[in-house]
Amino acid sequence: MDRRNFLATSVVSAVAGTVAGTASSGAAVAAPARPAGGVDGITVTQPDGLNPPGIRTAGVRMVPVVGGKYKVWTKKIGSGPVKVLLLHGGPGFTHEYLEAMESFLPQAGIEMYYYDQLGCGNSDQPDDPSLWTLPRYLEEVEEVRRGLGLENFVLYGHSWGGILGIEYALHHQRHLRGLVISNMAAGMQAYLKRTNAIKQQLPPALLAQLEALEAKEAYDSPEYEKIMMEELYPKVICRIQPWPDAVGQTLRHANNKIYNQMQGKSEFLMTGNLKDWERWDRLHEIKVKTLTIGAKYDEMDPEDMQKMAKMMPNASSFICQNGSHLSMWDEQAFYFQHLLRFLKAV
């Protein structure tokens, strides 16, 4: 069974008591502003730098991509000189699991932009497998940058978003003020080495069962699901229980077709079109100020995050000692303390 289906099923009952304050991800439709003089004791500010003329959209903007053929959803939150565009993971997931960001970045005076990649969440979802490739998504990020008018901005990429972040820095570095690569190694061989080591920690009988199921490509079987959900994911994906509602929303809204084509049907194997991606030998080309983030219990080796930082001339790293792949949730205070320190200094 693919990750979306068996994870989403597992979180349905768990999310009821989750982290409070998670923001809604829906794109609200703004009502027309009242006249400046006020009606019924309500006064609405006149247009100015912070309140532009026209219909208010709560920061939501649909940006044309693929040469204007489709549109992707973005949402601006906060205002400040440091602007951060967020690239979610997956491939095929949504911005929702990153919603912890808005509890920290805007309050620090940082302007942030959510963005659902094409085929994901609130964005257009064409049924066209030719669109689900790394080069096409790379071009999409540049289209989004231009559409939002971002220049001298920080690009944040988590997991698959980190792959996109590295690629963007290698191709469009001149637009960047800074780069954050969170919980993503610079190549798939390092990722597979780590996931294999994690599987080796299973009891021998369970490991043998898992390997037999993988040999048969029985990823949809209840047995495979049980091992993933009970033995692996609670340890390396998110270590808090229940999982935050924002994480559950992402999993329920994920686009499996994209995930299966680019990653494959298992989180612990790589059979999709990203399987040969390696950029270790080009990290030295990334000159912009960069932060890499890892976690002790992540499915990505934290030592790889530190190694990546050493291979870039203007990079630093930090490791969450109690966190996993979603360390913005399961080691939240430490994660944002160090992320904000970087963003304020970049």
PLM regions: where:
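N-terminal secretory signal peptides and thylakoid transit peptides that target proteins
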Residues: 1-14
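Conserved HGGG/HGGXW glycine-rich cap/lid loop of the alpha/beta-hydrolase fold
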Residues: 73-125
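Active-site loop/oxyanion-hole signature of alpha/beta-hydrolase fold enzymes
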Residues: 114-160
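Conserved hydrolase catalytic core segment
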Residues: 151-193
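Flexible "cap/lid" loop of the alpha/beta hydrolase fold
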Residues: 179-217
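Alpha/beta-hydrolase
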Residues: 200-202, 208-288, 307
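Conserved loop-alpha-helix segment in the C-terminal half of the alpha/beta-hydrolase fold
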Residues: 280-322
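Catalytic active-site module of serine/aspartate enzymes centered on a nucleophile-bearing elbow/loop
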Residues: 315-346
